[in-house]
Regions:
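Terminal amphipathic alpha-helical/low-complexity segments used for targeting or macromolecular assembly
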Residues: 1-123, 248
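Left-handed beta-helix
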Residues: 129, 134-135, 140-141, 146-155, ...
Length: 248
């Protein structure tokens, strides 16, 4: 198998750990053992100078917290979508929940400085759902992406708790700093901060590492934003006035 195929296999076991009633060909304990064994082999190949077992043990220790976070994401989707008939439906049928669940796993590996694997996980979710979440993004509990297609969340984005995004939202970089030789300066904060209890409607674009959307705010559809917004704000574009004329 290729590396992406092997990572897809690991990801399948990771989903079984977090949603055993849906993805569980193995029981949860068996899935944890499988993901640990497979992941340790890949980490040993990619990080020959590091202790692969120590890395995987640290990842494994974080799985209960990841499970808790994912459960809050399921609750947020069920509570926030009147079309949701059950939490089981959310887990089985909502692409946003799938993408966020994969992100929660990939983010833990990113935090452990594991190369390549988190990005492959993110791209597997991207190809399946149309939702592109960089594994470096920090996302609080009760996160819900409704519909999902076309959502982009950048590496240094920080998202608070109880945030909801709709399709086509971009949380991206505004511009990239270059050094004296013209090469990009990496490792800088490039993506926005979204505080608690924010709703961002379809096709809104929020850019820049110094941009903060204050808590309890709403960002309307198709808004293009590169400036910070105070808490309890509603941001929207002025509606164009339609011209109605007789065709006679």
């Amino acid at each position: 198998m290729t590396l992406p195929q092997r990572i897809a296999h690991i990801l399948k076991h990771g989903m079984a750990v977090l949603h055993p009633c849906v993805y569980g060909e193995l029981n949860s304990r068996g899935a944890i053992d499988e993901i640990a064994a497979d992941l340790q082999r890949e980490v040993a190949l990619l990080c020959p100078d590091r202790d692969a077992k120590e890395i995987v043990d640290a990842f494994r220790a974080r799985l209960p917290e990841v499970r808790r976070l994912v459960d809050t994401d399921v609750d947020a989707a069920y509570d926030g979508d009147p079309a949701a008939t059950s939490r089981m439906e959310v887990v089985m049928a909502y692409p946003g929940l799938y993408a966020v669940t994969v992100h929660r796993l990939a983010h833990e590996l990113y935090r452990l400085n594991v190369p390549i694997i988190p990005r492959i996980m993110a791209e597997l979710a991207h190809s399946k759902t149309g939702i592109d979440i960089h594994p470096g993004a920090t996302i609080g509990e009760r996160f819900f992406i409704d519909h999902g297609t076309g959502v982009v969340i950048g590496e240094t984005c920080v998202i608070g708790r109880n945030v909801r995004l709709y399709q086509g939202v971009t949380l991206g970089g505004l511009s990239f700093v270059k050094d004296s030789s013209g090469a990009l300066v990496k490792g800088l904060k490039r993506h926005p901060n979204i505080e608690d209890n924010v709703v961002i409607y379809a096709n809104a674009t929020i850019l820049g590492g110094e941009t903060t959307v204050g808590h309890d705010s709403e960002i309307g559809g198709n808004v293009w934003l590169k400036d910070s917004v105070p808490p309890f704000s509603r941001v929207y574009n002025q509606q164009p006035a339609p011209a109605i004329r007789s065709i006679n």
